[in-house]
Amino acid sequence: MVRVPAMRTLENALRRVGFMYVAGVDEVGRGCLAGPVVAAAVVLHPDRHIPWVSDSKAVPALERERLHDRIVRHAVAWAVASAEPTEIDLINIHQASLRAMQRAILSLAPLPDIVLVDAFRVPELPMAQRGVRHGDRRCSAIAAASIVAKVTRDRLMRELHGRDPRYGFDRHKGYATADHLEAVARFGYSDVHRRSFRPPTLFDTLD
């Protein structure tokens, strides 16, 4: 894990040259068979360090929950947005992910002066942006966004499980685990499944 001071280096450097509000953005759920893709954008307070903020995939679930609550409590601004399965099926997961990130960024108040992105450039933003390779491991703002997005989506998938427990969304969060695929083979699609995500060996008989 990268030390926290090192993960703030880029953000601090950008503030020194005039970018007062530096946002990080990230998304989760790209590879799932069910549920939305969820994006979060976060502007961290420059004087409030939150220890152990790192890539959400590297943080245990209970610790993610704790960090999520600290991030949203102390951030200058934060926002989440999503693209639902119907939108994903209509425009593809890549475009839906970009739209979710764009929505999250534009929901921030105040709007950031610059956005740090982990991978692809987010279209149609009115502010500067900068790509940071492996940003969720190298940049606190992106790592914080990763945690907020992950916890938000996990909570949503648990809610979806409460509405329809047949698929086990509380366990696999919509990913293509063996028990999830078995449930789809048995019960068919639910209204939160992405019909464009179709492992053909299993799903060709489900139409």
Positions of PLM-derived features:
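RNase H-like, Mg2+-dependent phosphodiesterase core
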Residues: 1-207
